Amino acid sequence: MRGGENRPPARVQSSSEELELRHQSLDAFPGRRLPGRGIQPAAKMSSVGKVTQVPNGKAYQQIFQAEVQLVHSLAATRKRAAERSVTLKSGRIPMMKKVETPEGEVMSPRQQKWMHSLPNDWIMENPVLHREKERAKREKARESENTIAAREVRGLMDTIVPEKISTSTFQRQAEHKRKSYESALASFQEEIAQVGKEMEPLIVDTGGLFLKKLTESDEEMNRLFLKVENDTNLEDYTIQALLELWDKVAGRLLLRKQEIKELDEALHSLEFSRTDKLKSVLKKYAEVIEKTSYLMRPEVYRLINEEAMVMNYALLGNRKALAQLFVNLMESTLQQELDSRHRWQGLVDTWKALKKEALLQSFSEFMASESIHTPPAVTKELEVMLKTQNVLQQRRLKHLCTICDLLPPSYSKTQLTEWHSSLNSLNKELDTYHVDCMMRIRLLYEKTWQECLMHVQNCKKQLLDWKAFTEEEAETLVNQFFFQMVGALQGKVEEDLELLDKSFETLADQTEWQSSHLFKYFQEVVQLWEAHQSELLVQELELEKRMEQHRQKHSLESQVQEAHLDRLLDQLRQQSDKETLAFHLEKVKDYLKNMKSRYECFHTLLTKEVMEYPAIMLKELNSYSSALSQYFFVREIFEQNLAGEVIFKFRQPEAHEKPSQKRVKKLRKKQGSKEDMTRSEESISSGTSTARSVEEVEEENDQEMESFITEEVLGQQKKSPLHAKMDESKEGSIQGLEEMQVEREGSLNPSLNEENVKGQGEKKEESEEEDEKEEEEEEEKLEEEKEEKEAQEEQESLSVGEEEDKEEGLEEIYYEDMESFTISSGNTYFVFVPLEEEHCRKSHSTFSAMFINDTSSAKFIEQVTIPSRLILEIKKQLRAGFFEHLEKWFDQCSLNTRVTVATKINELDSELELHLHLHQPRAQQIEKDIHNVRAAELLLHQEQLDSHCAGVTETLKKKRLMFCQFQEEQNVRSKNFRLKIYDMEHIFLNATRSQKLVTLSNTLHQELLSYVDVTQVSLRSFRQYLEESLGKLRYSNIEFIKHCRLFSEGGNFSPKEINSLCSRLEKEAARIELVESVIMLNMEKLENEYLDQANDVINKFESKFHNLSVDLIFIEKIQRLLTNLQVKIKCQVAKSNSQTNGLNFSLQQLQNKIKTCQESRGEKTTVTTEELLSFVQTWKEKLSQRIQYLNCSLDRVSMTELVFTNTILKDQEEDSDILTSSEALEEEAKLDVVTPESFTQLSRVGKPLIEDPAVDVIRKLLQLPNTKWPTHHCDKDPSQTGRGAWACGSRGSSEAGAGGAVCSPPVLCSCPGPSSPKGFKRHRCQPENSGKKAVPSASATSAGSFTPHPKPNKMERKYRVLGDKPPPAAEDFKGIILTLLWESSENLLTVAEEFYRKEKRPVTRPDCMCDTFDQCAENISKKILEYQSQANKYHNSCLIELRIQIRRFEELLPQVCWLVMENFKEHHWKKFFTSVKEIRGQFEEQQKRLEKRKDKNAQKLHLNLGHPVHFQEMESLHLSEEERQEELDSMIRMNKEKLEECTRRNGQVFITNLATFTEKFLLQLDEVVTIDDVQVARMEPPKQKLSMLIRRKLAGLSLKEESEKPLIERGSRKWPGIKPTEVTIQNKILLQPTSSISTTKTTLGHLAAVEARDAVYLKYLASFEEELKRIQDDCTSQIKEAQRWKDSWKQSLHTIQGLYV
C-alpha cells in the first residue's frame, strides 16, 4: 500500500468531503478531545475511567481490580441513563398537519388517535417527549465536567474487592495487544488492495461498451443521409420528411451526448463506490486498531489520517482525468453535429428547386382545366335556367290562353284584372328570374375567380410553408405568372355575360308590349259588352220606374179613401146607444164597395206598360250586334225580330277603311315577291352555318308552338262548347299563319346576317328600312293615281248592263280578301282580313326587335319568346267566342224578356187578387171589432161601478175589526208590564253589587218611561195608520172617477156615463167619515186608562228595598282587594313567563342561526362573527336579568328568603293558636279547594253569577264554619306544577284585559243570589211569585243572625301571619310577592274591621258573609298563606326551567365557537384575497402595456431589416426589445416578491389576530353563567315501584336517585397558545408559541373555542402553503413564457440577419 503497487486510482476529493470523512472517522472513535482540533466528540469520558498500565511490582492487584470495577460501574450507570433518556422513533420534530375534520365530529382521526393512545407510547409521535429530550440536552450542555463526574461517582456502588497480588498480567496483555495490532494492520493492507482489484474490471467494461455505442451511432447517421441522397424521387419528399431526417440525426447526436453524460456519471459513481468502500475500510480498521489498545487513540487517528490523505490524492487525480475525457468527447460530438447540418442543408436546397418547378406545372394545369373554363356550377345553372324558362314559358302561354275563359257571360272585370295582373306577374317573374340567374352566374364565376385567387394564395402559402422561399420571391412568382392568366379568362367571360344580359332586356320589352296589346284588344271588345249590359239594365230600371210612378199615384188616392173611411169608423165607435150604431154601420159598407172598383182600373193600366217591354229590349240587342261586327271587321250583322226569326244584314267597309284595305293588298303582293326572291337565293347559296342553325332553331320553335297551340285549342274546345265546330274555319286561319310565319322569317334573316358581322350591320339595316318605307309610300301614291284614272275610264265605258258584272267582280275580290269562320249554330261569318292586318301592323310598326347577338345565347332567347301566331290565334278564338255568345245571347235575352213580362203580369194579377182578398172581409171586421166592442164596453162600465162600491163597504168593516184587535194587544202589553215589575223583585234580592241596586232603581223609572212611550207610540201609529187607510179609501173614489176618461181624452166613456158615476160615489164618501169619527173617540179613552195603571205599579214597588246596598258595598270592597291582589300576582307571573319565553326564543333563534350558517356555508347569507358574539352578549344580559329577578345566584343571599325565614321563626310560637283554631277550616278546605287558576275562568254570558269561580273565594273567606256551598271547579291537570298553574292564571288575566273593550272589567268576587240551592230552584220555577216571597225570606234570614260580638281589632298577633312590620323593598319575585301579600292582608283586615265596628244590624246575605270579625280574619289569613305557598312552588319550577335553559345554552355554545372561528378565518382570508387581487391586477395592467410594446416590436420586425442599410434601425429595435424583456423580468420578480410578502404579512397578522381574538373570546366565555352558578331547585324524589327498588338492591346499586352530573370538569384552567410549525418557521410568520391563556372557568365553549382555533389555524396554514405554491407556479410559468419569447426573438433576428449574409 505504501509502495504504490496496489494503490487505487487517483480521485479528487473536495474539502467538504474531506471534512466529512474526517468527521465520520472521528465519530467512529468517541472519547477524549483530540489535541489541536476543534472537534467535540459525541460523548466524554472523565479521567476516572482512564485505563493506564502500571509497572509490575509497584501496585497491588486489589487496586487494579478496584479501578476496573470502577470503570465497569461507570459504564453501566451511563448505559442506564441513556436507556432512561427519551429517544424518538423518528428524528423529525412532530408536526401539526392540516387534517380535515369529518362532518359531525369535533376532532380529527389523528387527534382521536392521540387521545386514545397510552402515555409514552413509542408508536405515537409525542411532542412532549421531544420537548423533554431537548430540555435534557440543554441542561446537560450547561453542566460542567466536574459536576458530571461528581454525579457519576455518587452513583457508583459501594463494593469491596478482596486484595490480590499479580506481576505477569501486564506483560501478557502487552504482547497480546502488539500481535493483535500487527494482524489488524496486515488485514487493512489486504482489504485496500482487494478494493482496487474489484473496481478495475468495472471501469474497463464501461469504457468498452461506450466505444461500441459510439461506432453504431456514426454508422446509423451515415446510413440515414445515404438513404435520402441516393433516392431519385427526392421531389416526392415533404419538408416534414426532411425535418424528420434532421430530427433523427439530431436525436442520434443528442443520444450520443446523453451517453457521454451517462459514461461520466457511471465512472463517477464507480469512483464514489470506491470512496465508500475505502471509508468503510478506514472506519472498520480504526475501530479494530483502537480495540487492540496497542496505540493511544490520538496515534490511531494520526495513522488513519495519513492513509486517508494518500487515498484522497489518488482519488483527486482520477476525477481530473474523468473531467478531461468528458470535454474531449463533447467537442468531437459538436463538430460532427456541424458537419451533419451542412450536409442536410444541401439536400434541402435541391428539394426546393424541384418543388418550385412542380408548383408552376400544377398551376398551369389547374388554369387549363375544364372546371375553370366552364365551371360545372355555371353549366348546371344554365341547364336549370333552360328548364325553368321552359316551365315559366309554358305557364305563361297557358295563362294567355285562359283569356278565352273570360268571355261573356262568365266575364267579370275583377277576373280580367286578375288575369292581366297574373300575366304581368308571370312576365315580371320571368324577367326577375333572368336577372337572378345572371346574378347567380356572375356570383358563380366570382367564386371561380376566388377559387383561382385562393389557389394562387395556396401556392404562395405552400411556398412559404415549405420555408424554402422568402415572401418577396413568392410575390414575384405569383405576380408574373398566376395573376395574368386569371385576368385574361375573367375579361372574356364578363363580355359574354354582358351580351346575354342586353338580350334579356330587349326580350322583356317585347313581351310587355305583346301582353298589353292583347289585354287592350280584349278590353275594348269587353267594353262593348259592358255598355250593352248597362243599357239593358237601364231599360229594365225605366220599366220599373214607370210602374212605380203609377203605383205612387194609386197609393195617394188610396190614402184619401182610407182617411175618409177612418172618419166614418170614429163616428161609429163614439155612439152611445144601439140604434145609432146600426145606422153608421150601413154607411161604412157602401163606401167599401166604391174602393173595390178603383183597384181594378189600376191593374189594367200597369198591364199595358209591361207588354211594351220586349220591343225595347230587341232594339238594344240589334244595336249591340252591329257594334260587335264593326269592331271585328265582320261583314254580317246578326239580328232578330219579335217573332224570333233570324235576319242577317251585310255591311260595306266604311270610307275611312277603304284606303287601308288597298294599302294592305299592295304590301302583301310586294312581300310575296320578296319572299320568292329570298327563297331562290337561299336555295342557290345554301347560306352560312349560323343562318342554318338559326332556321333550324326557328323551325323547331315553330313546331313546338304549333303543337302547343293545338293542345290549347283542344283544351279550350273541351272547356267550352264554343269551339265545337272550329274545324271549318281552319282553312282560312292556316293562310294567315303562313303569312305571319313569312313575315317573321323575313324579319329574322337580316338580324342573323348582322349577327355574323357582330353588330356592324345594325346601322345599315335601319337605313335600308327607312329607304324601303319611303319607296313604298311613293309607289302607293302612284298606284292610287292610276287606279283613280282607270276607274274614271271604266265608269265612262261601262253601260248599265255591265254594272251587274262589276258587282259580281267586286264580290269575288271581296271573297278573295276575306276570311270566314263558322260557329256552332252553322252560321258563317266573313272578316275583312286586310283591315285587320292593317290594324295589327300599325300597332306593331313602332317596335323592332334585334336581340339575338350570339349563337350561344340564341337558345335562351328563343326559349321564352311569345309567338305572334299564338297571339293571332287567341284573337280569332275571342272573335268566334263573342259571335257564338251573341247568337245565344239573342235567344237568352228573348227568353228572359218573355219570362219577365209573364212574371210582371202574374205579379199584377196577384196584387189585384190580394187587394180584393184583403178588401172583402173589412165589412165583417168593422161590424165585429167596432160595433160589437162598443156594445160590450157600455155593459162593462156598469159592472165596474157596482164592484167599487162593494169594496168600499168591505174595507170599512175590516177597519172596525182591526181596532178591536189593537185594543186587545194594548191590554196584554199593560199586563206584561206589571208582571215585569213584579219579576224584578227577585233581581233585587239576588243583586251582588250595590251599583246594581242603584241601577235597578233607575231602571224602574226607565221601564215606566219606556212603557209610556211604547203605549203612546203604538196609539199614535194606529191612529196614523187609520187615517192613512181611510184617506186611501177616499182617494180610491177619486181615482175611480179619474180612470173613467172621455173619448176626447183617449178613454171610452161618454159624458152621460160620467154624471151617473159621480152621484153614486158621493154616497160612499159620507159613510167613510162616520166610521172614522167613532174609532178616534175610543182610542183617547184607552190611552188615559193605561197610563194611570203603570204609575200605580211603580209607586208601590219602590218602597220595598233599602238594606241590601250596605252589605253589597262591603262584599264589593273585599272582592276588589282580592281581585287587585290576583292581578298583581299574575302580572309578576306574566313578567316571569315573558323572561322565560324570551330565553327560550333566544335559544331557538340561536339554534336557527347556527343551522342557517351551517347549511348556507359558502353563500352570501352567512352569519358574521359580530352577529354571533352580539347574540351571545344579548343572551348573557337576558340571563343576568332572569337570575336577578329569581334571586337564584349562589354568590349572594336572597333577602326574601331571610325575611321569610325570620318571619316564620319569629311567629311560629305565636301563630300556633291560630293554626290550632283553624284546623276545622283546613279539613273543610281539603274537601273543597279553590285554586288560583280558577280565577281566570270568568263567568260566561248566560250563566248565573253564583257559578263565578271568584264566589268560592268569598265563601271561604266569609262563610260560617258549618255552612257548605257547592263550588265551581275549573278543569286542570292534577299533575300541573305550581308554575304551570300560575302561568294559566296570567294568561287568563291577559285574556280578560283584552276583552275589556267589549264589556266592563271582570269582577272576580261576587256573591250568589239565593240563600240556598233549594231557594235558587224555587225562584227559577216560580218567577211570578218571586217578588212577593223575596222580602219575607230576607227578613227571616236576618232575624236569626243578630248575635253579640266584641269589637274587632286587626292588630292582634293571631291575625298578623306575615309579621307586624312590612318586608323590606325587593326587586326579585319572592320579595315582590311577599310585599303584595302583606299589603293585601293589611287592607283586607282594615276593611273587615271597619265593617264589623258598626252598630248591630241584620245580615241580609248570610250565605256570603261571616257573622263575626274573627271568622272573617281567620279565612283571610288562611288564603294569604295559600298564596305564599303557591308562589314558592312557582319559584321552584322557574329555577328548574332556568337550569335547563342554561344547560341547553352551554350545549349550543361549542357550535357558536366553531362558527365564530370559521367566520373569523374566512373574513381574514377574503381581505387577504382582495389584497392579492389588487397586486395581480396591477401586474396584469403592466403586463398588458408590455404586451402592446411587444406586438409593436414584432410588427416592426420584417425581412428588410436584415439588410446592412437598416442596421441602425435593427439595432435600435433590438435594444428596445431587450429593454422591454428586462423590464418584464424585473416586473415578474417584483410581483412574486410582493405577493409573497403580502402572503406572509397577512399570515402573520392572521395568527396575531387569531391569538388576540381567542384570548378575548375565552375571557368573554368566563362571564357565561353555568348551572353551577345557579341555586339547585328543590325537587321531590319521584316515587318508584317496589319491584324496581328490589332489582336495584339485588344489582348492588344505590337506592337513591343520582344527582345531576356536570357536563365537564369545572374550575380554572390554563389554555396553551398557538404553536409554530415548520411552515411558520420557514416563512418567519410565527417563531415562538403565543402566550397561554388562563380562564377562571372551564366550559364546553372554552374547549370548543380552543379546538376551533387550532383547526382554523391548521386550515389557514394549508391555504397559506397552497397560495405560496400558486405564486411560485405562476412566476415559473411567466418566466418560461418570457424565455420562450426571448428565444423566438433571437431566432428571428438571427434568421433575418442570415438572409443577407
Swiss-Prot record:
Acetylation keyword on record? no
Whether DNA-binding counts among this entry's keywords is: no
Q: Where is the composition biased (Polar residues)?
A: 683-692
Could you list the residue ranges forming a coiled coil in this record? 171-198, 757-804
Q: Locate the compositionally biased regions of type Basic and acidic residues.
A: 672-682, 755-766
Disulfide bonds, paired cysteine numbers: none
What's the protein here called?
A: Coiled-coil domain-containing protein 180
